[in-house]
Amino acid sequence: MRTYDDFLMESYQVREKMVADKLRPKYHFLPPHGRWNDINGAVFFNGRYHLGYLQKIRNAPDERDFSSWQHISSRDLLHWTYHTASLDEPLEGKKGDYFNSGDVMDGMEIPTIITNMPRRGICIYQCHDADLSHWTPLAENPVIPIDTDEFPECVIFDPSGWKEGDTYYALIGNKNHRPGYEGDSTSLFKSKDLKQWSYIGPFYKSSRRWTAETEDCACSDFFRFGEKHMLLMHTHHPFNKCQYYIGHYENETFYPEINGQLSHRESLLSGPETLIDDKGRRLFWGWIADARDADEYGWQSIMTLPWHLKPTSENRLNIEPASELQSLRYNPCHVEDLFLEVEQEITVDGLASDCMELKLTIEPHAAQRFGVKLFCSPDLEEQTVIRYDTEQQAFVVDFENASNDKTLSYRCGREVLKSGGLKQTVPFALGDDQALELDIFVDRSVIEIFVNSEVCIVQRVYPMRPDSKEVRLFCEDGRIAVRDIVKWEMDATNPW
């Protein structure tokens, strides 16, 4: 008979393996071990930030995988406490029966989860605890059965919801099969009691000038944004594309006016989730997948840092890192007024690190291509190149030589990125005489680059050499002035 000592020894061995992994991030949240996906159920409640995520544990002997909706909370957005699982394994099926994504409904007096249960349909859970630890299913679950013939044009999948006046609304599914609504879409339902739901119709009509017919509206999140509304989502085809619409909402229909993209396939970022806190901030998290396998390393996937989504006066999107991250800074290093000429590259003393925040102000003077290199080994065998191209009006993150590990597999859905194509291109138009303001967060195997408070570029890289920590600046043509550089080491928030 096995005792707790047996399990404790195994737990110790797993923990030691995690601690020794030089690519395991220190201040980006990730579970203690195992693989997970999709962030769910974000809500600010009773003075705490609460997040859920879908945990998967392989269990080959009975041909099933264990699936649960895990629950964490924090007072400061940085240090997270584990709760018992919000929703535990309720499924009676074979391997592949997982929880699907869901949402804590907005505007509710009683915290309410709406989610899709495989082979059952849309289910609702409510909680009366101050710490949101115990969730009770409605007796009427599933409130929208997956096998119903009542809504033939709807796809029962990935719900989100909110309360408006005395009416509950839910966006159900990532497609709608009504003719004329091809491409990404979702279906609107409403209810007076959370138990009986009526179908309204397609929530919005997508346009091929913005999105392809193959795209869908998964992990939807709909909310007021400035004077408009925003619909946030990700698509499966192409994979790793988080995008949003900003538009107006009227008579139970959303009319998109602006389309924007938060991530590109090479970023491995998907599964967006937001909440609004007691400061009125709309905070965003995304799920960043891995190019390494959990079976070999014992863990897989991380969360983005918390992003603050802000509407501009023109009802467009600005993105900034949450201000709480500043409390992790220590050991500052400040450099001013560096000038680079044609085909010049320099290493800046004092900046080498694999866990830091790096802020730069760069003025391009007739330079077309310039940028910064991170995770550089002294001989440049390993390097990650972040290049801005003024002619192309885009950033190119070149991670072709970011790692000498040739077993990495950057999966984008069914597609695997091949050597020779390990580049991420992110459109960004720099105005005339405008400086580049870069706020770069480096955390061992992930980079997040906030650009002029307008976009955030995410990239996973896996430098293997212990000396791959140098920071270099380069100018390929013209001339640039680097007016200001500040680097801070960043304190760890993960226990290991």
Name each model feature, range by range:
Residues 1-158, 163-212, 224-266, 286-336, ...:
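Beta-rich carbohydrate-recognition and catalytic domains
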Residues 218-223:
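Functional cores that coordinate and move charged inorganic groups
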Residues 37, 217, 269:
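Short, well-structured alpha-helical interface segments that form or flank functional binding sites
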Residues 10-15, 248-496:
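Beta-rich accessory regions
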